[in-house]
Amino acid sequence: MRADRRASEALDQHRREADEQGWSVVEVGGGGRRALPFAHTVGLDRSGHPELLLSGRGRPEAEVLLGSLADEVLAGRRFHVGDVLRSGPWPPLLLLRVSAPEALVAAQAMRGSDEPVAALQVVWADDAERWPWDPAWVTSAQEQQLFARAPKVAEPRTFT
């Protein structure tokens, strides 16, 4: 009962933030032996844009990165599957369609509909600009869980 109340209060807080600024970032604990913590936006769905999900980055970095991308969406930018973003202090970022939208529990609850919420995963490259599905990808203390399928062709569109 106490956990349900905390979850409800947290959802209300994210709803207020989304009402005020158009989005909020929700952090989700790993919750399983192999699951890693991740973060996702709530509120972008209201503007007709998929929510954004990021795994493998710490809380402050996830909030800054997702918040920056969310602000771009609210300013009129639209992100698409296959876009590669190269800006700011981050490594190249590839956007993929989330194939497990049930992971975005808060976004689904805010949507208030049984229709799965659409989302894009912000996948980050390693220092050599390789993606996690590349056998040469260098893992470090930071690993990312994929909520999307790796592309069959590694020829994404690049945007700055």
Residue ranges and their predicted role:
Residues 1-33, 44-47, 56-160:
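Acidic, proline/glycine-rich low-complexity IDRs
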Residues 38-42:
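A short, structured beta-strand/loop element
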